[in-house]
């Protein structure tokens, strides 16, 4: 039986991409999926790439999702903070930035001991007064930070368009 031996000094066509470390395929900061713990026939292929996170199973919802919305009458930020109690969260306004900070010390869960900390910053839109920003925490662990948008001053009016007979662009004189 013949055994193929690959010498390290021989470069193959896709050399950096055959590496078992899969550096380009790592999703840094994301939790592991169950499928990541088991090798499959496709993951053993040197050309296999893990699908992008937006195409994977909806377990990404469980990762501290943040959403910022600009509606007609208000600005809002929704942030999943279900692993934190209200005492472990701080919301501050510094100039035109909202800072959300959450931290809990090491504690035991079903897998062992864990501690968590995060910092998020959101720019406050120009038409939102920083003094009117409020925050609330829902029973399912979603922190909502919002503020009303300033209404345009004065009533809306339509401006008529007049037609002029002379051109706006005139040709430059020839030399």
From Swiss-Prot:
Region Disordered: list its residue ranges: 142-175
According to its UniProt entry, one GO biological process term is: negative regulation of amyloid fibril formation
**Where in the sequence does glycosylation occur per the annotation?**
170
Query: Which ranges carry the sHSP domain?
Result: 56-164
Q: Which GO terms describe its cellular component?
A: actin filament bundle; axon; cardiac myofibril; cell surface; contractile muscle fiber; cytoplasm; cytosol; dendritic spine
What is a single molecular function from GO for this protein? unfolded protein binding
Function in brief:
May contribute to the transparency and refractive index of the lens. Has chaperone-like activity, preventing aggregation of various proteins under a wide range of stress conditions. In lens epithelial cells, stabilizes the ATP6V1A protein, preventing its degradation by the proteasome.
This protein's name: Alpha-crystallin B chain
Source organism of the structure:
Rattus norvegicus
What is the name of the gene encoding this protein? Cryab
